[in-house]
Every structure is written in C-alpha cells, then in structure tokens.
Regions:
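Sec-dependent signal peptide recognition
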Residues: 2-8
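C-terminal motif of bacterial Sec signal peptides marking the signal peptidase cleavage site
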Residues: 13-16
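Structured C-terminal helix/loop/strand segments within mature extracytoplasmic catalytic/sensor domains
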Residues: 18-38, 218-233, 237-375
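Active-site-adjacent helix/loop patches that line small-molecule binding or acyl-intermediate pockets
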Residues: 22-33, 46-47, 114-253
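A short, well-structured edge-of-sheet supersecondary motif
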Residues: 33-72, 334-336
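Active-site SXXK
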Residues: 78-103, 334
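Residue-level preference for non-acidic, small/hydrophobic
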Residues: 85-92, 126, 151, 236, ...
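Short, well-structured active-site flanking segments
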Residues: 94-121
Length: 375
C-alpha cells in the first residue's frame, strides 16, 4: 500500500516501505484527524484512492524526485476524464513543431464545426476551464493512434486514449478534416486519419457499480469502462515531470517542442480563468485547481502557482499538479484520484464531488504543503 521511490537525475532507485520504516509523509497525512480526510479513509474501499506525492530537491544541476505512493496500481482502473487533455495538448504541440507551415497561432476549424479557433486558444481553454470541444479539436488534428504513440515513445505509459469527450460519435476511429488558414487568402485541408479499432481493456475494476443510466433509462448491472480512456497515475506523473523538468530526462524521453511552445504550455497550465476573460464569479480561481484551494471560491494567493490538469466525470475526481510557492521557495508534485459515487449508479450525475471529493483533495494538498514548509 505504501511505497517510496527516488529518481536522481537519470538514475531510478526504488524501495518499498516496511513496517519498521518511519512514518512517510503520505502515511502521516492520511492519518489526519481532519474530517475531510478522516471520513474518506474510514471508507477507503468505497473511494478507490490512488495518490503519488513527489518531493523535489535540487543538487547542483540535478533534479532529484522522491515519489511516495498510496495504492498506486496501473492495473486498478479509474476513469481519467479531462486529465487526458494534458497529453493531447503536448502531442499537438509536438506535431505542430514538425510542420513548418503551422504554429500555435494558425487559425483553423474542424470540418462541420462553426467555431474558428487557433491551437494556442484551444490549449488555453483546455487548462483554464477544461473545455471539452477544445480538446476534441486537438484530437481531430492528431488522431488517437498518433497521440498514444507520441506518449509511449517518450516513456509516458501505459496510456490508451480511445475517444473524444462529451460529444456524439466520441469513439469514431476516423478523424474529421481540419481547414487551416495559412494566410489571408490561402486555406489548406487536412486528410481524415483512420485509427486502430478500440480494444477492450482488461483491468481490475473495469466494471463498476450496480447500475447505470443509458438513454435516460436505468440499466441493472455494472457500468463497463473497457472501451474508455486509460491514463493511470504513473503515466500522468511521468508526463508532468517531463514537461516541468525536461532536463531531468535523456533526450529521447523529452518532447520535441520548442522553448516558445513549452513556455506557452506552462503559462496555460497555471493561468486562472479570469486572466483570459472568463467571468470570475462563475469561473473562480480554483475552478480547476482542486489541491489546496478547490473547496473555496476565494482568490488564490499570487505567490502560489499550480500547473495542473484536473478531470471529473462518472464520480471520479483526479488532479495532476506541480505546485510552486515562490515566496517560501518550495515545490512539489501531487497526483491523486478519488471515486465519490455513494449510490453506486453511474451516469446519473449524482456524485459527491462538492461534499466529499474536492474537500478531500483540497485538504490533501494543504497538509502536504505544510509538510513541505517544514522540510
């Protein structure tokens, strides 16, 4: 259940904690008497929690990662929801970097779609408010096979992105053409991409619950996630490390994106919704920042920046974040998921996000932040 791993430069050291090991940070935090954590831990089996907390230390030119895990297991399935938008954004930037005629500022639209956008705007919308349509446009540009291959080639695995989000024909294996505006008078049309058929996943917990809603009708029996996206904690953490600290990895594990593209991505990851024009009353600072601040709508302190991507759907909340405090000179990573579906019925939009899930993740972030302040 409890595991600790250290990554020093390019060397990985792994060791499991024994009963005689002093209490590790996650063990201490998850033993908290705060009801936001305690109530979840008292019903642990219900919530399918997985957590990876990464301490970050610097030694000369080396970045040292020390990972602490709680119940992290690639074979135990959880639905990743919108966290899959992070790899889509990275893969899209890498593909753009290889095409001389395109950039993040290139206007385009998907054939059959009335919205004209740019790649940069789509990426900003993905991180600021977790826009599903923006993600789907990037997936039409990439195709599922190309996205998955790019991740796997850089060591971000296991991963299986199979479908779009919240749209008709989400699992269509053929992408739609994109129309690009290359200058004021020239347009270019991309060709549809035919992707591999989706194969069912064979993982623990791939069928969940006692019933589900389909076509507005209740269906008895577990909900089958075997054809859904798969993006476990280990892969999420691996991608975050490679984007925040590319220098800690060999060249073949770094994404081929330009410095300008990476700067744009990092800015998008920590930008607050109001900073790019969204109504701050509806899209408050912590709208998509679950750790530390997710359980309140107050403005976030300016000295704390959270580079992250959240996901929430089917009762599953996930956040993958790099948290930086510029005033106190601390930094750490945290990736966690929790299931909050008390009635065990899926797709009914009756989940305990606000009552249990977000408060748990917020308090988890706060307690680990306090540990970072003291170490």
């Amino acid at each position: 259940m409890w595991q600790r791993f250290a990554l020093i430069g390019l060397l990985v050291l792994a060791a499991s904690c024994s009963e005689n090991t002093p209490a590790e940070p996650l063990e201490k935090v998850l033993s908290s008497q705060n009801p936001k954590i305690k109530n979840v831990m008292e019903n642990l089996e219900e919530h399918e929690i997985q957590i990876r907390y990464t301490q970050i230390d610097r030694s000369n030119d080396s970045i040292i990662f020390t990972d602490y895990d709680f119940q992290v297991d690639e074979n135990n399935y959880f639905y990743p929801a919108s966290t899959v938008k992070f790899p889509a954004a990275v893969a899209a930037l890498e593909k753009l970097n290889a095409i001389d005629s395109l950039s993040i500022n290139t206007p385009f639209f998907v054939e059959g779609d009335s919205v004209k956008t740019t790649f940069g705007k789509a990426i900003s919308e993905i991180f600021a408010v977790s826009d599903n349509a923006a993600n789907n446009r990037l997936l039409e540009f990439l195709g599922q096979d190309d996205l998955n291959k790019r991740m796997q080639e850089r060591g971000v695995s296991p991963i299986r992105i199979a479908h779009r989000l919240s749209t008709d024909n989400a699992d269509d294996v053929t992408t739609k053409p994109l129309v690009f505006y290359l200058n004021d008078s020239t347009i270019s049309l991309s060709q549809p991409i035919i992707n591999s058929p989706i194969k069912p996943l064979d993982l623990n917990g791939i069928q969940k619950g006692k019933g589900f809603i389909a076509d507005e009708n209740y269906q008895e029996g577990p909900f089958n996630f075997s054809l859904k996206n798969y993006y476990p904690i280990t892969a999420q953490n691996a991608l975050l490390k490679r984007i925040i600290f590319p220098e800690a990895f060999p060249k073949e594990q770094r994404f081929n994106i330009s410095d300008h593209q990476r700067d744009y991505l990092l800015t998008a990851m920590h930008t607050l919704p109001s900073d790019i024009g969204y109504d701050e009353n509806e899209f408050y600072d912590s709208y998509v920042k679950f750790f530390m601040f997710g359980d309140n709508t107050e403005p976030m302190p300016e000295h704390i920046k959270i580079y992250n991507k959240v996901g929430y759907a089917y009762g599953t909340l996930t956040d993958c974040a790099y948290i930086q405090d510029t005033k106190n000179h601390l930094e750490f990573m945290l990736t966690a998921t929790i299931l909050v579906n008390d009635n065990h019925i899926f797709n009914d939009n009756t989940y305990e996000y606000e009552e249990i899930g977000i408060p748990f993740l917020a308090q988890l972030g706060r307690e680990l932040y306090e540990i970072e302040l003291r170490r």
